[in-house]
């Protein structure tokens, strides 16, 4: 039984999917870095739509981690962990941190 051709196709598909996931994670990182900078550069009230985007992205990344069991690098894992809580006081806390120059939730 020659299983190599099918196995090779699966490996090639796996490689392509992994590369696509890594590219998408990099895009998430770039968007999050931009959001963090924008949040830190504006007042708290004007930052609310930006926070909405940031917490939406955190939720999507948490789905990747917990539902699909894809373990990203430490930086993304830290973001998922630290931005798990989305409420007024959490937003105040992160707004102050980002305004003080923190570039990534840690």
Curated annotation (Swiss-Prot):
Highest taxon listed in the record's lineage: Bacteria
CDD domains recorded: CdiI_NC101
Subunit text: Forms a contact-dependent growth inhibition complex of CdiA-CT-NC101, CdiI-NC101 and EF-Tu; the complex is a dimer of heterotrimers.
Function: Immunity protein component of a toxin-immunity protein module, which functions as a cellular contact-dependent growth inhibition (CDI) system. CDI modules allow bacteria to communicate with and inhibit the growth of closely related neighboring bacteria in a contact-dependent fashion. Neutralizes the toxic activity of cognate toxin CdiA-NC101 (the C-terminal 154 residue CT fragment). Does not inhibit toxic activity of CdiA from other toxin-immunity modules or strains of E.coli.
Protein name: Immunity protein CdiI
Organism, scientific name: Escherichia coli (strain NC101)
Gene (name only): cdiI
